[in-house]
UniProtKB/Swiss-Prot annotation:
Note on cofactor: Binds 2 heme b groups non-covalently.
Keyword Transferase set for record: no
GO biological process: mitochondrial electron transport, ubiquinol to cytochrome c
UniProt gene name: MT-CYB
Protein task: Component of the ubiquinol-cytochrome c reductase complex (complex III or cytochrome b-c1 complex) that is part of the mitochondrial respiratory chain. The b-c1 complex mediates electron transfer from ubiquinol to cytochrome c. Contributes to the generation of a proton gradient across the mitochondrial membrane that is then used for ATP synthesis.
Organism: Corvus frugilegus
Family named by the database record: Belongs to the cytochrome b family.
The keyword Chaperone is annotated on this UniProt entry: no
Protein name: Cytochrome b
Subunit note: The cytochrome bc1 complex contains 11 subunits: 3 respiratory subunits (MT-CYB, CYC1 and UQCRFS1), 2 core proteins (UQCRC1 and UQCRC2) and 6 low-molecular weight proteins (UQCRH/QCR6, UQCRB/QCR7, UQCRQ/QCR8, UQCR10/QCR9, UQCR11/QCR10 and a cleavage product of UQCRFS1). This cytochrome bc1 complex then forms a dimer.
Amino acid sequence: MGLNLRKNHPLLKIINNSLIDLPTPSNISAWWNFGSLLGLCLIMQIITGLLLAMHYTADTSLAFASVAHMCRDVQFGWLIRNLHANGASFFFICIYLHIGRGFYYGSYLNKETWNIGVILLLTLMATAFVGYVLPWGQMSFWGATVITNLFSAIPYIGQTLVEWLWGGFSVDNPTLTRFFAFHFLLPFVIAGLTLVHLTFLHETGSNNPLGIPSDCDKIPFHPYYSIKDLLGFALMLIPLITLALFSPNLLGDPENFTPANPLATPPHIKPEWYFLFAYAILRSIPNKLGGVLALAASVLVLFLIPLLHVSKQRSMTFRPLSQILFWTLVADLLILTWVGSQPVEHPFIIIGQLASFAYFAIILILFPVVSALENKILKL
């Protein structure tokens, strides 16, 4: 037997078994592209982020100016910043579609993979939040103030916890310095968790659109899915580069062009678009602690999804009632996202409350009930 380095070398064989000779279902659709797209997003964000960190100064008196300097005086600094800022949006688009795919096709029944995935989402949200504070514009400062303040709703230890988090009695220089440290560290935590996520995935192999075992018909990942992933890369990079070059501030808040001022509150404090659904749920409850719990529950509910699966079928491919419910949930999330961007006044308050109620009702009550009904109708 000739020495096949790819299959025998201690390091190369890990790469080989993950990216080249990996047995993959023959019928997975484009919805299975988002895992590799998320990997691409992560690599891109780490590279652009590293280049930005070389020119950034984490100090309240210099942060805003250092970002402006980067965009004006550093070679291609404007491009690196625009790719990094909009890359975050694409990261979230991909992760939301990836989660939606997992939900639709019952991929959450790979429980370890799913749970690590939810932890990855939480880490990504934390990273994006602390990153948004770094340019030290108005929305950075007030966003940080509002969101960190939520910890003060925790009974007994809340106030102490918030002051410990701030490193003082308000969001100030210590807060900015530690947020920069977190923003530098967390992407590497995400990279580590991604490897754990893949390790668990490769224990069971990928799910497929039919939700049935596919061991009888597997094909090697390379060249079939490596070339398919390259197409996905192109289809994501083209809109990203277009956005970064033609309309880089489309998704940002104009308030952030004003340096942070603790004495002037912006008229509408709101997070980046990818947090608006959770922000709408937070605002829909007229009680601080209740809102914080609902906010946490809006993401943590994902941990419960494998436990709420009562259908005898894995995927929703042949479950039309669950499909209707799924797309209703998608529409509901879009409504929440829109409401989160609107001021707190009639009719947005009641719309937000109804949409928040619908979100939890669909996931926790209607999905299990409808799944049980489908089992009965189909005599499963």
